[in-house]
Structures are given as C-alpha cells and as structure tokens.
C-alpha cells in the first residue's frame, strides 16, 4: 500500500460530498471564544526557565542578523535568573551602535500542525521605546545571514510585536530565498487589548490546525485566519524572542530595561475521533466514494478505503490496490 509521510492531502481533488481527507478536529475554542486546553497534551519542548544551566543550552544568543535599528545584539544582554529569561536593552556605545539589545532563538523545534504554543511574558516598558517581539522562524543557529537550509519557504509567524502597546500585533510571512525579492507578506491583525501590555505579564499563543492559524491574547481568541501558505500552519519552527529597533531611537533615560519571559510551552491537540482502518465513505445522497478508471467518483456500489493517520496528524486515503487519493487520483 502506498503511504505518504509528513504530507497533507489537503489539495486532493476530493468530491464536495465526500468525507474530508483531513480529520475535522473538535475546535479548541469554548463558547466564550477562549481556548480550552482540557484534553491537550503538554509537550516536553519549551522552557520553564527554572534551571539556568539547562536554559542556557536551550537558547542560542543573537540572531542571524547582527543588529536591529540602532541596537546591537549582545550575548551579555541575555540572562536567566529568578525562573525567567531576561532580554535587556541598554544605552551604551559599542562600535558604531549607541544601544545594545538581547535576543535569543531556541535550539529546539516548536512543533507545527495540531499544536498550541504559548509564551507568558512582560514586554519591555513602553516608555523606553524598544520593541519586544515573540515570533517563530528558523535559522542555522550560526549567526547568519541565512535561514535554515531545507526549510523553505521559511514561514514566519509574528505572534506579538509591540508596535502599539495597547494591541496584540500579529503578522505572517514566508521568505523562500531569505531575500526581500521573494519575501511574501500575508497581512496581519492588530487586536485591541485595552491596556498597556508592558505593565504586566500576559500570555501570547498560537494554535495551528484545521488549515487555520488562531492567535490568542491571555487565551482569548484575537484573530483567526486561513494562511496564505500551508507551511505557516504545518511546519515546525524555532521560537524567537527579541528586542528590536523598529520604534526608532530608544528613550535613553528609560534604560536599562528588560523584556521578561516566564515560560514557553507547547501542547498537542487531542486525538481526533477518526481512527485508522477501513471505511466506506458516503455522500449525503447515499452514494459511495470510489476509484474508477483512475478517477475518484461517486457511485451506488460501495468501495472500501484504507484510512491511514500520519505522525503530523494528517490522513491519507488509499484503495485496496494502493492508489492514494490526492497523489494517484
């Protein structure tokens, strides 16, 4: 039997009346639009920042670009203490830069499909005018300038960037060649939260499944979107936490200051109701999905399909002869 690994058949030519190829999971959103993690599995990836030695090995200091605006990334601006990760912004002259920033990229992958990833953090104080960023992207962890080879189109999820401290500012991109020439922006959303987020700790989360991205502020749904590229909801990514110079010159007398991260956690979605096995797939009018002369069709006579679940939470349908719907049909 022909199987597919780590490949969705979302693009398969499935007839409208047939059962969807990708299982329709129960939504993780309760009636009040908050995510409900009951039944989800907390994964071992992430960091609670309770062990500085362990955390230091989990995070690469610096990014694949050496500076952001007038701020130079420095390893010394990254510290682990008090059960937290601290990224500092300082007014100090280093080379031609008047400021220094902290930034880290995880050495571990945050899984993609069928997951919810959450960061609890307190943004650097708004009065200092240094942007705090929570995002997902993967580099080679060698200081740059390239993103991870073989991970094209290099999807990027900006979960929060403090362009406006009273909003959760979200954006999505892909960087196929890691250049502006091929860079594609798919838009974003600014979700008003009604408070200055830098005054307290908040959670920032993203759920990736069912072909959708769902972003959460304090576990309240902030934005749901069908991304412009499937890699945005499928591919694993590194977690990036950084200070950026996108707000212009920092306010010197408000520095030093820090962006404080309490934890990074990831959950895996509850198992779907559909179990692997042999099925007959019917349409609303009682006809059966069948494979005839190399073409999927609806007919009166039933045909058995083998449903196979893959490790990325997708499914494939194959005939007894081994033809896979979406690949061979």
Question: Can you say where each PLM-predicted feature lies in the sequence?
Answer:
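N-terminal secretory signal peptides and thylakoid transit peptides that target proteins
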Residues: 1-16
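GH16 jelly-roll
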Residues: 9, 32-272
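Beta-strand residues in well-ordered beta-sheet regions across diverse protein folds
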Residues: 88, 120, 216, 282, ...
């Amino acid at each position: 039997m022909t199987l597919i690994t780590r490949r969705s058949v979302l693009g398969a030519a499935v007839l409208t009346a047939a059962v969807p190829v990708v299982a329709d999971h129960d939504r993780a959103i309760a009636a009040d639009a908050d995510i409900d993690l009951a039944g989800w599995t907390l994964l071992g990836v992430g960091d609670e920042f309770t062990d500085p030695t362990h955390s230091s090995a989990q995070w690469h200091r610096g990014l694949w670009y050496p500076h952001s605006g007038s701020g130079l990334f420095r390893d010394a601006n990254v510290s682990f203490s008090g059960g937290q990760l601290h990224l500092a912004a300082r007014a100090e002259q280093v080379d031609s830069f008047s400021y220094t920033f902290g930034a880290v990229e995880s050495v571990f992958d945050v899984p993609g499909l069928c997951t919810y990833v959450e960061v609890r953090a307190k943004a650097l104080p708004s009065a200092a005018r240094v942007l705090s960023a929570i995002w997902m992207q993967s580099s080679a962890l060698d200081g740059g300038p390239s993103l991870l080879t073989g991970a094209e189109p290099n999807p990027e999820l900006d979960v929060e960037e403090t362009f406006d401290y009273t909003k959760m500012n979200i954006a999505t991109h892909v960087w196929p060649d890691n250049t502006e020439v091929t860079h594609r922006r798919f838009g974003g959303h600014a979700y008003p939260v009604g408070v200055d987020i830098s005054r307290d700790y908040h959670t920032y989360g993203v759920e990736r499944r069912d072909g959708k991205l769902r972003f959460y502020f304090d576990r309240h749904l902030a934005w749901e979107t069908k991304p412009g590229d499937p890699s945005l909801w499928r591919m694993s990514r590194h977690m990036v936490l950084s200070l950026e110079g996108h707000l212009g010159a920092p306010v010197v007398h408000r520095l030093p200051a820090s962006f404080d991260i309490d934890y990074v956690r990831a959950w895996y979605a509850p198992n779907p109701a559909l179990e692997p096995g042999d099925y007959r797939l019917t349409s609303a009018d009682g006809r059966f999905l069948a494979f005839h002369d190399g073409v999927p069709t609806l007919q009166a006579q039933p045909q058995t399909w083998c449903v196979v679940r893959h490790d990325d939470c997708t499914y494939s349908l194959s005939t007894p002869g081994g033809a896979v719907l979406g690949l061979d049909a």
